[in-house]
């Protein structure tokens, strides 16, 4: 392989590794700070959150949710539970579980106690949870 393509390939591989590390760091900051998932799910994702959290959160190591399902749960919350929805537009239409806010009534997931997340942040958070906790 000529030197220039080899250098370009090495640079590409290095950058992709850095991007992965940056994505993981971004997801970790969302988990621990912005979304404050650790408040309920615990720093280690084991469901041992703060005693002041609204309820027992699932152990993320044991979840069977795939990426798309995890994204939906983060965006839409869990109807009838304390799991908040982090997409501020979650129930404006029928984007969550095919249901509207009116149809859910009192079972609508609560607003997040911290802040809402955009689609990029929701995806990064799901990727962090999958890479860090699920099945480990």
Give a label for each model feature:
Residues 1-8:
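Bacterial N-terminal signal peptides that target proteins for export
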Residues 15-16:
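N-terminal signal peptide c-region/cleavage motif recognized by signal peptidases
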Residues 26, 65, 69, 120-124, ...:
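Extracytoplasmic/secreted proteins, especially bacterial periplasmic and envelope-associated proteins
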Residues 19-21:
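Boundary at the C-terminal end of the N-terminal hydrophobic targeting segment
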Residues 92-136:
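C-terminal capping alpha-helices of c-type cytochrome domains
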Residues 45-103:
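Gly/Gly-Pro-rich "capping" loops immediately C-terminal to redox-active cysteine motifs
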Residues 34-35, 41, 77-78, 87, ...:
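Sec/Tat-exported extracytoplasmic proteins
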Residues 23-44:
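Sequence/structural segment immediately N-terminal to covalent heme-attachment motifs in c-type
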């Amino acid at each position: 392989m000529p030197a220039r393509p080899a250098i370009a390939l090495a640079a590409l591989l290095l950058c992709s590794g850095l991007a992965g590390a940056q994505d993981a760091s971004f997801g970790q900051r969302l988990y621990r700070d912005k979304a404050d998932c650790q408040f309920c799910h615990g720093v280690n994702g084991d469901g041992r959150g703060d005693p002041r959290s609204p309820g027992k959160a699932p152990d993320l190591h044991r979840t069977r949710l795939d990426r798309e399902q995890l994204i939906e749960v983060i965006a839409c919350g869990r109807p009838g539970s304390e799991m908040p929805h982090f997409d501020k537009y979650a129930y404006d239409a029928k984007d969550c579980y095919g249901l509207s806010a009116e149809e859910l009534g009192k079972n609508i997931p609560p607003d997040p106690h911290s802040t809402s997340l955009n689609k990029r942040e929701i995806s990064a958070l799901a990727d962090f949870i999958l890479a860090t906790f699920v099945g480990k």
